[in-house]
Amino acid sequence: MSDARTIHLDQPSRSRIVPTSWILGLLTGSLLIVIAMMGWADLGMDFLKASNAKYLLALMLLAAIRYILRYQSSGWQRVARDFCEYVGLFLFISLLGATATYPAAAATSGFADAALARIDAMLGFDWVRWYMLVVDNPWLQIAGSLAYANIYMSPVLLLGGLALSGERARAQLFLVSFWLAALITMLLFLAMPAVGPLAYVWQGPIPYMPTSALYQAELLPLLRDNMLGAVDLGALQGLVCAPSFHTAAAVIYIAMAWQCRYLRWPLLVINGAMLLSTPVEGTHYLVDMIGGAMVGLFALCTAGAIQYSLPKIRASRQWRETRIWQNLTSSSSAAVPPAVQSRDG
């Protein structure tokens, strides 16, 4: 591994690193908004409950390691510092995004399943046939459930690789893209709540209950009627049908891993399997996945555009500060009268 990748010597990449204070400010603002949403929806959270406290303790541990190693700039200490920072931020974004869907669900009304199923029919996608393929092959049920759970395996591998190579700018690009995809997904969810094809399309007894089960159909009415009461971080369920966040995440994972030859093909296989499992395990329409892919691409492009504009923003800011300083110094010089030499001197 070259020194340019191990140590932050690439000046263009360094100039695209987002100040940590900006990211913390962004996440703090997001947290305050979610807290306000929870209050509006009459939802609480008991942090003394073990299922909630374990995530809080994990975040505190990662933050503590990051703080202790804050001055390390080489060796395994730097890798550990960066990895803890990246994983901590990813965990915070994931928990915050999933939690936000609960008060967001309380603000929804109606269901978009009829329109989504109609679009699937126009696309020629038969969800029931796809589901029956899994029902008739038990090994697909096991493989599908494992593949669907890989939404949390890919980022650990990806962020670990970026921490090892010292590519801080790319790690931040991934995190900002993931945050932006979560935000867009939640906003679209407000306009397109749905219970999913298992609840809407399937008729009769359910021969195989996938990972996402019937949570949308069960939880959305409770949240709309303010009957849930509290959110449990240890029992968070996917409430968003359209667009598919698993698909958005897979697009981001694959795109970010494509530049790393050690992770490119493993993550392509892992996320390809996750995408194949999404219609059944996530109870998604095909149009959900198309929408999710578009969300992932848009988030990547937007975050990339912001990051690539940072050098220009910094240069413009530096130019303005220089001009202000020059004006101040020139003004102060003009205000001081020139020294008059004494005749005796």
Each predicted region: which residue ranges?
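Membrane-interfacial alpha-helical segments at the cytosolic side of multi-pass membrane proteins
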Residues: L157-L164, T247-R264, M294-A305
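Membrane-interfacial catalytic/cofactor-binding modules of polytopic membrane enzymes
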Residues: L187, A191-Q259
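Interfacial segments of alpha-helical transmembrane regions
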Residues: R81-F90, V156-P193, P197-P207
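Short, Lys/Arg-rich, polar N-terminal cytosolic tail immediately upstream
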Residues: M1-I17
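N-terminal transmembrane-helix/juxtamembrane module of multi-pass inner/ER membrane proteins
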Residues: R14-A58, A80, C84-P155, S331
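Membrane-interface loop-to-helix entry segments
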Residues: L140-S154, Q237-W258, L286, I290
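Aromatic-anchored segments of alpha-helical transmembrane domains
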Residues: S30-M38, S94, A182-F189, G272-V280
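Interfacial helix-loop-helix junctions of multi-pass membrane proteins
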Residues: G196-A199, C241, G272-A299
